[in-house]
Amino acid sequence: MNINGAVALVTGGASGLGLATSEQLLEAGAAVVILDLPGSAGAAVADKLGDRARFSAGDVTSESDVTAALDVAAELGPLRVAVNCAGTGNAIKTVGRDGPFPLDQFTRIVNINLVGTFNVIRLAAHRMAATDPVDGERGVIVNTASVAAFDGQIGQAAYSASKGGIVGMTLPIARDLAAAQIRVVTIAPGLFDTPLLGTLPDEARASLGRQVPHPARLGDPAEYAALVAHIVANPMLNGEVIRLDGAIRMAPR
């Protein structure tokens, strides 16, 4: 899929991995719609990114919000790329000092990370399937899982379950959408220098980076975005989960 001239939807595009992805796709010639929460910096980010960027406020778990973002994308042209970067996490033990893991907190993480991702996939794929193919492809969908899907740490039951679900649905969805000439690939990032880690002291962030075998540092969001661009451009990448983690395997805590 040629990025130049394509229209892309990026969820969570106002910060972190999503922002880097939006910047990368725009630099490669795409038009980008950022879908992020109303309280995010999405409007300011889109304004800064220029004429080919748009912001649509919404929640990935809402069918109407995602549909509205896709309608904004349709104003720019046929949707060709969707990148799921929206997500959240928590750190709660299955049984802690205050009792069992609150079920509403578990379902909240799964709903945003897993159900929200699938909601965007199904609605974006429906739009893509109605477009004319270009060089044998109608679209590319890239999802964001995590190494926590494989190496979940203490307190990550909900987060690991949500990201493991994204890993598990990648291949069947790719098979579902193959007849429509739509590819689906998932990236499982390791430790990246995102706003979430940016709240930690410098020494704590440096210590986390030293846990990565090579390169012994936190990942740069631009490196995630570069992989997204390669996935979009490489027609043989489909149904795969790619760990982007510097060979780290997380310890229990």
What residue spans do the PLM features occupy?
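Catalytic Tyr-X3-Lys loop
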Residues: 88, 99-119, 142, 159, ...
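Residue(s) in the substrate-gating loop at a strand-loop-helix junction
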Residues: 146
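Active-site helix of classical SDR
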Residues: 121, 162, 170
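Conserved mid-core segment of classical short-chain dehydrogenase/reductases
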Residues: 89-107, 126, 130-135, 155-158, ...
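C-terminal substrate-recognition "lid" of short-chain dehydrogenase/reductases
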Residues: 220-244, 249
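Short, small/polar-rich loop/turn modules that mediate ligand/substrate recognition or access, typified
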Residues: 178, 183, 237-240
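Catalytic Tyr-x(3-8)-Lys segment
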Residues: 111, 203-223
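Alpha-helical segment proximal to the catalytic Tyr-Lys
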Residues: 126, 174-176
